Amino acid sequence: MQNQSEKNTFSWSEFYAHRKEIRKLYPSVYKLALKKKLFDIVAAELRGKEKILDVGASTRRLGERINKKLSGVTYKTMDIDRAKKHDYYSLDEIKETFDVIVLSEVIEHISFQEGIDLLKRLATLLVSGGRLIVSTPNLHHPNRYWDSDHKTPYRYEEIAAALVSAGFNVRNIYRTYNDRYLRRFVRVYFMAWLHRYLDVDFAKSVVVVAEKP
């Protein structure tokens, strides 16, 4: 684990500068490419026989889809919930490295500083050139964030800036939204103008793909 001096190296001025740069690349949430599911993004990042770690894996649903749709991928999980079977129950137990790590709907449950520390810790579990895929509730959605156990809200430019502050290079930022065909069609192709006017978004999550240098 990181010592206190390492934790204190975070710079708010650098974070704000990173956030500004992300805003230049993606001036609004509507500039983010829309994907149906997190799995679509993860699958696009897996290159053959790679190892993936799912942090906060819960029911291992992502692994079920990977095993069904992809071949040669080694899928492992880490979750603090011992009621479910996982490969690891603490990051400190992990003594191997991975090509891809997924952190899905986890970071909003801890404080901002804990989030930065977590991102830095995950970087140590990635190979050079490894990808970290982070999803978090989309703050432009009217009610997506407001669960009682959520602690830290992140706008898309903030979660991306946090990753840069933790030493990653941001490669892509996406929104995810999936629904019944007709409802999705109407929202994506007919109601988008109204969402933009009201500054709200129907996409439930923001997903950032970042790379370890």
PLM regions with names:
Residues V164-S165, V170-R183:
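C-terminal alpha-helical "lid/dimerization" subdomain adjacent to the S-adenosyl-L-methionine
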Residues M1-V102, Q113-K120, L125, Y156-E157, ...:
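Conserved N-terminal segment of class I S-adenosyl-L-methionine
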Residues V207-P213:
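C-terminal lobe and adjacent flexible extensions of AdoMet/dcAdoMet transferase-like proteins
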Residues K84-H86, H141-W146:
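A short acidic, helix-capping loop that chelates divalent metal ions and anchors anionic groups
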Residues G129-T136:
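Conserved beta-strand signature within the Rossmann-like core of class I S-adenosyl-L-methionine
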Residues V106-H109, N138:
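Hydrophobic adenine-recognition pocket in adenosine-nucleotide-binding enzymes
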Residues P137-H141, P153, T176-R180:
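Short "lid" loop at the C-terminus of a central beta-strand within the Rossmann-like core
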Residues N143-A162:
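Acceptor-substrate binding/catalytic loop of class I
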